[in-house]
Amino acid sequence: MRKFLKTIIKGTLFCLLLLAASLTVCLAAGLVKLPDTGEQVCEVPAVRVIEPLPSEAAEQEEQAGQLDTPEQEETSEQENVSEQEAPSEQEEFSEQEPVTLLFGGDLFLTDLLQSKYRQQGISAAASEGLLSILRGADLLMLNQEFPFGTTGDPMEEKQYTFRVDPGYVSVLTDLGVDIVTLANNHMLDFGRGPLTETLAALDGAGIAHVGAGENLEEAKALKTFEIGGKTIGFLGASRVIPEYSWNASADGSGLFTTYDAKALVEQIRKAEEGCDFTVVYVHWGIERSTQPEEYQRTLARQYIDAGADAVIGSHPHVLQGIEYYQGKPIFYSLGNFIFSNGSYETMLAELTLEGDRIGIRLIPCVSEANQMRLLGESACPAFYQSLESLSPGIAIDGDGRVSAWQPGAAGVQENVPGAVPAE
């Protein structure tokens, strides 16, 4: 019993000593106030303060400044939003990366090409070296000078009427085609049925199209691509159709035409509002003529004055000259791409967009028995010289890069902005 009492007394003394030590700590920390009544009151803080570990101290110190007044919190939120919206250096750089647009002329898939394609694949249409260029561009555009279809009857009293089975749309995808213009003088050779089949075939293959549609709104519609931080817009129209009835209407299928420039000019002005670069592809001119008609020059200038950044032409089936107007390039005719069974020289036009500059490079080609390949290096100087003779005020260097050099020639200005070949 005595032993038990000693144990209780010792325990009580230990608790009193522990309580005294705790009060001393509270006084030192300022957690205990001594009111005038002389009674000691211990105020417990609403939030218990725990000293961080050394490894956590720096992180908590950094966060402390962010947990301030409501105004400071609002400012922090705004700063955080700004930081999220502001592009990183990597994003800014990617927005300035060059964009390569590649353009070819008239495309038709002859019976001979179709036969070879079934046996050899896409090598029947283009050489390996050319294919790498076609597929390597950010975007490839051609004039599709035929409808895909199996229905309809050929137009009476028309010398040449074209139609290709929709299954051969794979030729275009194999070539790397991204967009075609359908505004030309062969799209309704077999009536409006094949036009509907054409739109379906291209849509199914993921190939964009301009210049024709199920109604006028579709035919004149702008098609855009987002490439390298730029919005690139495309419009297509024809100045060559066999009959007025080929025109699209409010409720009828057909083509978008530009005999009167007003409608296309209006579309260009609308495109300028949302596009960084606008291309107008026009079917015009006289077949087999290497010189543009005066109306081609007039229309091209109207398009550029309205906001077009480049004008591409087709229909003559031969090359016509190049011109700069207000610093913007005009290719009056890119001739044939892959079109006939014969042998002929032609070219692709490569536009490189870098900032506000347009670098232009010509890629000479030769087509033989429907297969297109790069022109031999030894033949290129004569090719460039021939094209220069069709292009007053234009210089073409040994690599096919184009620049304007003669002040005042054909609307060309000295030191034309944008007429700077890519390095």
Language-model regions: role of each:
Residues 11, 15-59, 68-71, 77-79, ...:
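Acidic, metal/ion-coordinating pockets
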Residues 1-12:
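N-terminal Lys/Arg-rich, disordered targeting/topogenic segments
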